[in-house]
Amino acid sequence: MSDSRPYFDDEYGGRYILVEPGDFRMGDSSGTRSEQPPHSVSILEPYFCGERPVTQAHWQSIMGLNPSAFTDGWAAGLRPVEQVSWDDAQEFVSRLNELDQGAERLGITGEWRLPSESEWEYMARAGTTTRWAFGDRDSDLNDYGWHAGNSGASTREVGQKKA
């Protein structure tokens, strides 16, 4: 981890980083209709958010199955889980809360939940106002994320790109 924000690691291999409250501009004036117009949003409470997507191995350890389509190869468990709905994700969180009931991390006893759309965008923007958290140049996207143009038509192991 390159910064000094508080974090904790769970027993499933996940790292969760503290996101402090703050204000930001949410939306994109040149984006889809649902992203317009940009507007000010305040995040009022701190929260912890996963540093990486939930892996297939983590999902299977909690849910007892792996619904993902891209399961070939020795590193499949390190790939992000996919083929899950919002309802599936809510069930995952519910089961995680059952398993973790009363667990204390960094002196805090809390519950797992999905971030709101505002919380997710605030965290993903990382204090920037550019199109991407790393800037405005599409040509830099290959360094920061997997997509149809560089993934070989498959998901890839989490944590392989710049943060």
Question: Which residues fall in each region the model found?
Answer:
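Acidic, Ser/Thr/Gly/Pro-rich low-complexity segments and short DxT(G/T)-type signature motifs
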Residues: M1-P6
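A short glycine-rich, aromatic-capped structural motif
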Residues: F8-S68, V84-D87
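Functional-site microenvironments in short loops/helix caps that host divalent-cation chemistry
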Residues: R25, S30, A75, Q83-A163
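Short, solvent-exposed beta-strand edge segments and adjacent coil->beta transition regions
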Residues: P38, L44-P46, A76-L78, A153-T155
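A short, structure-level motif marking secondary-structure boundaries and short turns
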Residues: I43, W59, G77-L78, R105
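N-terminal, well-ordered alpha-helical segments
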Residues: A57-S61, R79, Q90-S94
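Surface-exposed, flexible coil segments in extracellular/virion-facing regions
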Residues: F70, A75-A76
